[in-house]
From Swiss-Prot:
The keyword DNA-binding applies. One of its GO terms (molecular function) is single-stranded DNA binding. Homotetramer. GO terms for biological process: DNA replication. The keyword Zinc does not apply. This is Single-stranded DNA-binding protein 2. Keywords: DNA-binding. It holds the Pfam family SSB. InterPro entries: NA-bd_OB-fold, Primosome_PriB/ssb, ssDNA-bd. It comes from the Bacteria. The gene is ssb2. SUPFAM superfamilies: Nucleic acid-binding proteins.
Amino acid sequence: MRGKRMNHITVSGLVATEPRSFLTAEGVHITSFRLAAQDRHFSRNANSWVSGDTNWFTVTGFRALGSNAAESISKGDRVIVYGRLRLRTWGDNKMAVEIEAESFGHDLRWGTSVFSKRFYQLPEASDNLRTKYDVDEAETPEIHAKAA
């Protein structure tokens, strides 16, 4: 079962460690943190909220996601993570549950968030290329004014 990838998973939980961020020698930004996800449900018998077991995940984001996470996510934040689940085993009955994140962000059930869109510089060779989806500012001045 070593390194075997399974289906995608969506998990909500608490960022339990300060995110660790670094840049590889190849220039790939990586950010990872531990996520604690605890099931809670209302018990009619007890007439109160009951906490279930806590599941622990190591969440890792690469490239732009890793870079943005480093500036956006902090220990104690409530987040929702979507990505590929990977179970890594070693030794006698030791296992790590990892999520290679494709997307994550703050869980707005618990608070508010302010989004800032990032603009990345395209390589010079691509500057003159336009796709059918490109829109000139003169064609939609009201949209560009709102974005500014």
